[in-house]
Structures are given as structure tokens and as C-alpha cells.
């Protein structure tokens, strides 16, 4: 006689997935070590997630966690209404927070969430002037990020304008919910054992990049669908992807999710 096993419902609630996401960002993404200070950069719309990240950072042993809030509407108001000739003025303290954290051996996590069409009607020269000014002042910090001198991480979260571009047939509320579902699925935050799954995934990426580095292929040849492209690879090239290490030995994953491995092509003259 057969029998039917009734299994418990393993579906996680939204709050459980969000806590998982924050835990992944801190434990797998940022790799916070005891005693580190942490800077969180977050849009005001993502306050719920940012607060969970703060708590997870303290749970991981952070000594001090600060948040730098961003507001798209405030930024838009400036680009629309500020006088001409004022866009080389910046709030240096916003960049100084990054530089200070890096110089203290700290970690920086940024929650990126913005409406891609936010500045669609704004004078592009105003935006370009502001961006050039900020980039110039951030250069010392950017150099540390690009060379993995500190552990850093980028994650994302839905905001209404962005979500509705992704799901145009849904209401604003439904679009945000659907974008959350997509983010949770892509980051494995919808799984109870999300951290363990990420550890296995990063191990797989490491095996793949080590294999490819050992092969030292001369070129990659892409064919199909009207494409016939050969890309030469640099001598003694190294494949990267997945987790990385700081000079101090802290392992971090700069982007969650991340699925690719990559390398450098040969420079042509």
C-alpha cells in the first residue's frame, strides 16, 4: 500500500528573503571582518534593506556602521532648478566618507537603485559637469576600489520607475514586487541555504577561472548568427570572476549576483 509524505512549505516570506539578501551582501559580498568599519550607501527608497544591512554588518563584527543616504528627487530638483554655473560645486563630505572609510581599512557597500529615465529631460551638460567634478574628487577612492585595496560590494533593489520599465504591463506596486522576485531569484536569496549555495557557486567559478588560466588560450573564436569574431588574448593572461581578495587577505564578492568569468584581450596597434 502506497503512502503520501506531506512536506512542510519551504517557501520563504518576503521579509525572510530580504534578510537573506542583506546577509548575503554582508557575509558573501562584503566579507566584513571583526573590527572593520562599514559605510553603507543607499537611496532613501531602500531604507528597509539598508537597515537590515546595518544590522547584519554589526552581527558580523563591524565596529562602526554609517549610512550615506541618496535621494533621486533631491538630485533631480538641483539639475532642474539650480542656477547655471553651479554644477562644479559638490558636497565633498559625501566623498570624504568613502575616502575616510577606505583609509581606515574599512568596507563600503552600495545599494544601487534608480530610475534610468530620471534625468531624461535634464540639460545633459549640467549632468556631465557634475559627474566630471565628482569623478575627479573621487579619484583616490576609485583607484583603491579598482585595485581591490578594500572590500566592497554592489547590490541592487527595486524602485518604482525602474521596475515599471522592466514590467510595463504591471501596476507600480506589482512591478516592484515582480522585480523583487527577480532579484531574489538571481541572487539565491529565495533559498533558505542561500549562503551555502553562494559558497558552492563561488567555488565553481574559481575552478573555471583556474582551468582557463591554465589553458592559456591564444584567442577566443565566436561564431553563429552572422557573427564570426576572433579575439586574441594577452600573453600570460589571468582569468578573474567571482570572489577576490584584498592585499590584507579579506575575501569579498564585489557584485551579487555574479555569474561570469573574464580576462584581458590582446592590445592591437
Regions found by a protein language model. Name each.
Residues 9-265:
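Active-site bordering "gate/hinge" segments
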Amino acid at each position: 500500500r502506497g503512502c503520501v509524505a506531506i512536506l512542510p512549505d519551504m517557501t520563504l516570506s518576503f521579509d525572510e528573503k530580504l534578510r537573506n539578501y542583506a546577509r548575503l551582501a554582508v557575509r558573501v559580498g562584503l566579507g566584513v571582518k571583526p573590527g572593520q568599519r562599514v559605510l553603507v550607501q543607499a537611496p532613501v527608497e531602500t531604507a528597509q534593506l539598508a537597515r537590515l544591512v546595518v544590522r547584519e554588518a554589526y552581527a558580523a563584527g563591524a565596529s562602526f556602521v554609517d549610512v550615506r543616504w541618496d535621494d533621486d528627487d533631491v538630485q533631480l530638483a538641483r539639475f532642474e532648478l539650480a542656477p547655471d554655473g553651479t554644477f562644479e560645486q559638490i558636497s565633498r563630505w559625501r566623498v570624504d566618507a568613502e575616502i575616510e572609510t577606505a583609509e581606515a581599512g574599512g568596507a563600503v557597500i552600495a545599494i544601487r537603485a534608480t530610475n534610468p529615465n530620471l534625468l531624461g529631460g535634464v540639460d545633459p551638460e549640467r549632468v556631465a559637469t557634475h559627474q566630471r567634478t565628482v569623478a575627479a574628487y573621487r579619484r583616490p577612492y576609485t583607484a583603491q576600489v579598482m585595485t581591490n585595496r578594500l572590500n566592497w560590494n554592489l547590490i541592487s533593489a527595486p524602485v518604482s520607475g525602474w521596475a515599471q520599465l522592466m514590467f510595463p504591463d504591471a501596476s507600480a506596486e506589482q512591478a516592484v514586487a515582480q522585480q523583487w522576485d527577480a532579484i531574489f531569484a538571481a541572487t539565491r536569496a529565495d533559498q533558505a541555504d542561500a549562503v551555502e549555495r553562494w559558497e558552492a557557486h563561488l567555488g565553481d567559478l574559481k575552478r573555471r577561472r583556474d582551468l582557463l588560466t591554465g589553458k592559456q588560450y591564444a584567442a577566443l573564436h565566436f561564431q553563429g548568427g552572422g557573427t564570426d569574431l576572433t579575439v586574441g588574448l594577452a600573453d600570460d593572461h589571468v582569468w578573474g570572476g567571482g570572489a577576490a581578495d584584498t592585499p590584507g587577505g579579506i575575501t569579498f564578492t564585489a557584485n551579487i549576483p555574479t555569474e561570469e568569468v573574464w580576462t584581458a584581450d590582446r592590445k592591437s596597434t
